[in-house]
Amino acid sequence: MHANDIVLFSQVVELGSFKKAAELNNITNSVVSKRITQLEQALNAQLLYRTTRSLALTEAGKKLASSADMIKHITQEAIDDIKD
């Protein structure tokens, strides 16, 4: 499990789709799906209920989502500080 996978999970949740998160990161939908699946396996918990048209957070996903959002913002702040 990598911090960037948690950030990617946060983006999927925020954007509501694998496709939009893939476009944001210049990667394919299948890469997003694979990384989220690997994150779920590492945590031994399903994070998302997936259908062909929608995503919904599981209870474990809800718990991770709030922490993941903080991690995403802290990471972005660190990057911005370095660039300044």
PLM regions: where:
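Short alpha-helical elements of helix-turn-helix
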Residues: 1-15, 33, 62-65
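Short helix-boundary/capping micro-motifs
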Residues: 11-26
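Alpha-helical residues within the helix-turn-helix
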Residues: 23-24, 41, 62
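Residues within the DNA-recognition helix of helix-turn-helix
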Residues: 28, 35
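A short LG(V/I)-centered, amphipathic sequence patch enriched
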Residues: 40-57
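Short helix-loop hinge/linker segments at domain boundaries
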Residues: 53-55, 73-84
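Short, solvent-exposed amphipathic helices
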Residues: 60-77
